[in-house]
Amino acid sequence: MKTSEAHVMKRLLTYMWRYKWLTALALAFTFLTSLLLTAIPLAARWYIDHLVDSTETGSPVLTAFQFLILYYGLFIGRVLATYLSQLTFARVSNSIVRDIRLDIFKNLQRLGMSFYDQTAAGSIVSRVTNDTQAVADMFSTVFSSLVSSFLLFLVTLVTMFSLDWHLTIWILPFLPIIWFSIRLYRKLSNRLVKMTRQKLSDINVKLSESIEGMRIVQAFRQEKRLTDEFEQINAEHLDYANRSVDVNSLFLRPAMTLLQVLAYAVILTFFGLKWQSSGFTAGLIYAFIQYVSQLFQPLIDVTQNFATLQTSTISAGRVFEMMDRDDYEPKQAGSLKEIERGDIRFDHVSFSYDGKRDVLKDISFEVKNGQTIAFVGHTGSGKSSIINLFMRFYEFDRGQVLIDGQDIKDYSQEALRKSIGLVLQEPFLYHGTIASNIRMYHKELTDEEIRQAAAFVDVADFIESLPGGYDHPVTERGSTLSTGQRQLLAFARTIAAQPKILILDEATANIDQETEEMIQNSLKKMRQGRTTIAIAHRLSTIQDADCIYVLDKGKIIESGNHDQLIALGGTYKKMYDLQAGMMK
């Protein structure tokens, strides 16, 4: 994946090109700032030469008054131009970062589950927030400073040549030394900056992991272990940050200031040697000394901003790396726009997550509209993998999956998502209200349809007992509601969409027995007229399934209804007897 510094800068400039007129305005204000800043020493030179060295008669008070008006006029103009330049660059910066965040978020929505299964959530959050903010800092601070420094350096150098080119030539040997210093600094600091950003991402990962799993952390008394791990990562981040500071402290202002002092010494020596023969005026000497300072100041600013520039470039590279990820969810041909009935057939399907070891081996089954089938088996037998393939979270390796006799790949993504209702073991609720969580993206659903869906799964009474009813606020992940309540709301969300196919992935595994009994009738009503595939942990919940498939190590080893499997006396019966014994 191409993330070189030149490539990163080129891509960032393409974002800036979207706001080319606003950027051009910012550059114009920056150029005006440089001109006004360069004009101030010229005004001082005029004042000194006409007041101190001039033999012309005239009122000193009038000359001083004219100088003050000119000087403060230039100063106020420079301040105003600087303000407008920074303001415009900030607008461009904020717009660019908004676009980058939107683009990376859009790409995250397209990425398949394989990406999320392999990437820590904290790392993703770090790139979308911290790294994009570093890019914002680059445009609002670094880029504007670099442009301003370049223009000021160029205008100052031209002005110095126009004043006295002999003097200016004595300054030129310092430029290659400065260039070499900058190159050496970049070489030494690049790796340190990259590792500092990586350790910051690791901190976000560990923090996110700790917060999301706090119940488990406290239940298993893992606070000290996690604290030690966090302290180690934090110490590594501190080490790289301090090493970066060491390099910055050596190569930034101290080195540039030393070169500036040497330049002063050279110029003053030249003035001393040539004073009698050159005819230098006091105003020229003052202006030239000011321009030497003004010539070095942009170089000092550039070196000071290199640390931020490198951080921003590396951060932008990390952002573009994620933006360029193309391990999307499986592609759909999209020629079929609607599922008519919901008949499903798996025909000799095999699948591997890593491309080496099959987790599903030659899976074949069929379920008609209105029928219910269930998959049971020990952990790791492949039950959830079947759901992952059918939901098109992953692409199967061999075989074929058909819906209504058509290849599942021929349906549009919208048709599949609209016609399939998925209820997971861990129900997920979004920040919002009860009604918005039931409605989800189906904006066309009326409030009455929301209430009907809630009543259908017997959760309406609970909702209406809440303060605000359907407008009751839901916190992130619905943490203030019980697992059973969240699951009932997930059922209401599913039924509100009126899917033709129902997928229940251990949907009652985390519900207490009393709540389970309460929703069994609702589940039966939900399944009527719909093709239903259920993954079950509690065998008691799928005894009325038309067919039950027993999986072991990715293969179907038994199939039949409950009575047939009990009579068979195989794995299913052993599982059933074990659960029945635990219930006694």
Predicted regions and their residues:
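ABC-type nucleotide-binding domain
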Residues: P60, A265, K331, K337-K584
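Alpha-helical segments in transporter systems
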Residues: W21-L42, Y71, T88-A90, A136-S149, ...
